[in-house]
Amino acid sequence: IVRVSKTLESGNVNLRKSLAVVLEPTQVEVNVSRQNDMVKASSSLLEVILDLNTGRVQFSNLDGSKLLTEKDYGVQLMPLQYVQRIREKKVESHVAGEVVPTQSAPGQNTPGLDRGKMRTIVENTYEVSQSFILDEDEVIYGLGQQQTGKMNQRNQRLVLEQNNMQIAVPYFASVKGYGLYWDNYSITTFDDTPMGTSFRSEAGEAIDYYFLYGGNGDATVALLRQLSGQAPMVPLWTLGFWQCKERYKSQDEVVEVAEKYRKLGVPLDGIIQDWRYWGEDNSSWNAIQFLNPNFSRPQEMFSSLRKMNVKMMISVWPSFGNGTEIFKELDKKGALYPMVSSPREARVYDAFNPEARGIVWDYMNRYMFQLGMSAWWMDATEPEFYGAKQSDFNFQTKEGALRNVRNIYPLYTSKAIWDNQRATTLDKRVYILTRSAYIGSQRYGAGSWSGDIRASFDVFKKQIPAGLNFSICGIPYWNTDIGAWHPYGNVYNTAHKDPAYQQLYVRWFQFATFNPMMRSHGTGSPREIYQFGERGYWAFDVQEQYIKLRYSLLPYLYSTAWQVTKNGYSYLRQLSMEAPHDTSTYQISDEFMFGSAFLVAPVVEEDAVSRSVYLPDNTKWIDFWTGQILDGGQVVERATPIEIIPVYVKAGSIVPFTTNEVQYATERKWDKLELRIYPGDNGEFVLYEDENDNYNYESGAYSEIPITWDNEKRILTIGDRKGRFAGMVKNRKFIVNIAGSSSSKTVCYNGRELRIEF
């Protein structure tokens, strides 16, 4: 990892501490040499050359092959000055009598905000840009989550600004095995033309970026996690099925939904309460209290859900209505932005203010967490502003002017929960679903979804590259609203009762089975499985089939979560990450790897009876449904009846499955597991287990069982178990099956190595 910084100042320059980067610089052995105007710095992996004449920096392999180079004279720092007139008032503070600015604009009628004296703030900054030269045919990924449908991010201009459905991350990764993170949090334009590739940000003190070289896609993501923070373990139950809609209008309805799932015997782990649980009046917006009369007995609701082993997530926004207690408390601290949010009676809080973050958590803790809330749905964390003037973004946050830090705002809303929930207890893992994110959001236990998208096969297809590009930015937990947020329009007028929409929903449901989070949600039309018909009707049966498949995969999903945490791995992987030398994978946007084993090819065309699937050339592939072994490096045509999503398993994969049906993820211990071997190559897998929903694993309370397959000798080795934890299964049965054959053996495992020959 190389940090490159450029300023107009000379001498020792104290650059600001990064808000996204947590990795501290370390001593690295570097050989430095100079020849004329060229300065070369070489490490054991990388060579960096600085042209003192043009300011160009070039990155190369040790063999001299170029990875990336800046453009000659490709840097710009244009001085800018912002002037702001703000109001002041005396407020409660840690320092007696301290004056804290409310920062409402002159003459602005801001409900709930006091008026006071005026003063002027002048900020000197720069518009900063840096241009690079990429190879003409070089393919790059990343830039957060976009809704363009593009996998390759070349040949376009993108304004990176946090918005609903668009997550702004100024980072791209190349198929050449490197990544580049532009460390600037203001609105930034990415521009790629035949003349060059550039980042241009509207405010910054300096050019500041990080070059990461891992040699391949997986290794570069791992470096990005080292740079910006590792993703902690998620609770096991979060990998089960989630049900939601916009919105459950009473606590009785919430409990009724859970009861119906249990009565039907369809697995369910999480239910999500969307907005208005605080009441219907906009002045009570996001009070973070159950003030709605239809939620007057929240303790009863949590008690009922607890008896059914159903967890709850709740919607919390960063804006607060002017009639709420929390609004008034934040207002006293001068911690509300002056701009109008949604609704107009609400204002967004300054998440960069640690005291304000503490206030928000205090309400979440008192009125939600202590009652039994298990997870947090952080909506509109861009945040949303309406009719804001440019001068409004001169607001001085605790990290500088808001315009300078706008894009990193969602990271701090997640930080508010992570820091404070962990300070409250380590017995329950933080789990956050946030609509916007930034480099480093993963370190706070946050994942994202793709926002308020509309229902169509075209939009569905675009979610695949949106999620893959987002995951490449180092944030591993991502999902979508199954069936899209908006189901209505000119196409699906009856939504869940419309066979055409049911087809879209079921195809989307299959895709979601192979996402890090499997979650049904949307507006206008109910989404519960029983709303689509009764058991025996295809739209019900296929959903149930895939929910049960999801639960059978829990050992694989949880073990992959450990690889994400321990080794910086990813659930969602573009095919080039699996086969980096297969150029045919580079542009593919409608297939992906799910973990190490599964190649998934969602059905993204209406009424499709088959679809073509490219199998990378790095190995053989096995049809998940039939066991047929196929050579890589070819396109196959796979039949796609409504119950089938094409899934192929990489040869050599070892996939653990549960053997007992459950109603929730932790209902039964894994004392009997199937190990399914997909032959054709050597393989390995690490089965991971821990206490499921606390942080004891950070102190070593977990176990790993290494498993290897020797394809030539046809020997499976289940290695010695490493580690221990409270409640660990000490003795279990493994049913070992060879995919595509009748070969099967059952063994008893007590933690000592076993070798099974076939």
Describe the function of each predicted region:
Residues I1-V39, L77-L80:
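A low-complexity, Ser/Thr/Gly/Pro-enriched, surface-exposed linker/loop concept
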Residues S5-L23, I49-S65, K71-Y73, F725-S742:
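Extended Gly/Ser/Thr-rich low-complexity repeat segments
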Residues W418-V430, A437-S448, F470-T480, W485-I715, ...:
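Catalytic core of carbohydrate-active enzymes
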Residues S5-T7, R34-P235, K245-E246, Q251-D252, ...:
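Catalytic and substrate-binding clefts that recognize carbohydrates or anionic sugar/phosphate headgroups
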Residues I1, K40, E47, R56, ...:
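Beta-sheet entry/capping signal
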Residues V13-V32, A335-V340, D623-I642, S743-F758:
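Solvent-exposed beta-strand/loop surfaces of large extracellular or lumenal domains
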Residues R16-A20, P267-Q543, E578-A579:
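Aromatic- and carboxylate-enriched substrate-binding clefts and catalytic-loop regions
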